[in-house]
From Swiss-Prot:
The keyword Ligase applies. It is found in: Cytoplasm. This is Phosphoribosylformylglycinamidine cyclo-ligase. It comes from Syntrophomonas wolfei subsp. wolfei (strain DSM 2245B / Goettingen). Keywords: ATP-binding, Cytoplasm, Ligase, Nucleotide-binding, Purine biosynthesis. GO terms for biological process: 'de novo' IMP biosynthetic process; adenine biosynthetic process. GO terms for cellular component: cytosol. NCBIfam families: purM. Belongs to the AIR synthase family. Signal peptide: none annotated. Pathway: Purine metabolism; IMP biosynthesis via de novo pathway; 5-amino-1-(5-phospho-D-ribosyl)imidazole from N(2)-formyl-N(1)-(5-phospho-D-ribosyl)glycinamide: step 2/2. HAMAP family: AIRS.
Amino acid sequence: MDKPGLSYKEAGVDIDAANRSVEMIKKWVGQTIRPEVLSGIGSFGGFFALDLQKYQEPVLVSGTDGVGTKLRIAQMMGVHDSVGIDLVAMCVNDILAHGAEPLFFLDYIAIGKLDPVLVELLVKGVSQGCLQAGCSLIGGETAEMPGFYREKEYDLAGFAVGAVERSRLINGSSIADGDLLIALPSSGLHSNGYSLARKVLLEKAGIKLEENIAELGHSLGEELLCPTRIYVPAILALLEACEVKGLAHITGGGIVENLQRIMPSGLGAVIDSQAIEIKPVFKLIEKLGQVDKSEMFRTFNMGIGYIIVVSPLYHDKALKCLRDKGEKPILIGRVEKDREKVSIQ
């Protein structure tokens, strides 16, 4: 008698588990839906009807990103419900830097063995991030990839689309000598520099993730999994209140490289390092890893998550607007001509 042939499930891909996960995430996705969304989960594509009455000449702004090796910390700790917030933050904060209001988001989850409970936790985090950003989670993909990832390993990618009036598109071109730099604090490492952080703190120093660290006031794992801040509400309010010349999301490359990306030719900036409240986790990495200060500023955000460039005329108004939104803005520097680079002093 012939033996029965192999099934897809025996090969490592469980379609029934995938269907269960879809049912489990529907409640989280549903919480994010804006009126412009025309489709539900299960379609081949997500439908979003742009409200053209809000714009004279709309420009769509898109961005994609991941969470990087911060996911390794989440997987080591078995904590999966916050990295989805990181995923949304990394994408929406980028498109926000051009003045765009985030409209919708899509996620991609690649996993070794599909666990519906784990997928639900990941999507729960994504939905929480979307709620913070005011955008809809309108689609996604979960790929079970046995033999490519270990059973409990996964990776995340996200895609955000927003819109801005063409005349209000921000690209840094109007930045001028003497403009001021206002910074918004980060919550910690956000989602960058984790390869160096793990090398120093886990491998070199031998600290356990569950170990409480006096300098931090909690465990190392809690610090490393603190979600990336989403700056959308504060920045959108600021854009309505005053003229903003440039916005920089401080991610990989730190303050120097990300701020330089928006500077016109012939202009640079001077950052006052004394104005920056460097968070304890960065001091810990610098000390235990004997990492040079310049390398720290080139790798990590050092406590600054977003930088806003405004004319001195709007300085006071910008600070008030940001404080009214619950932010703690600080003046950290100014734009200067004939520098061609950003320097930290």
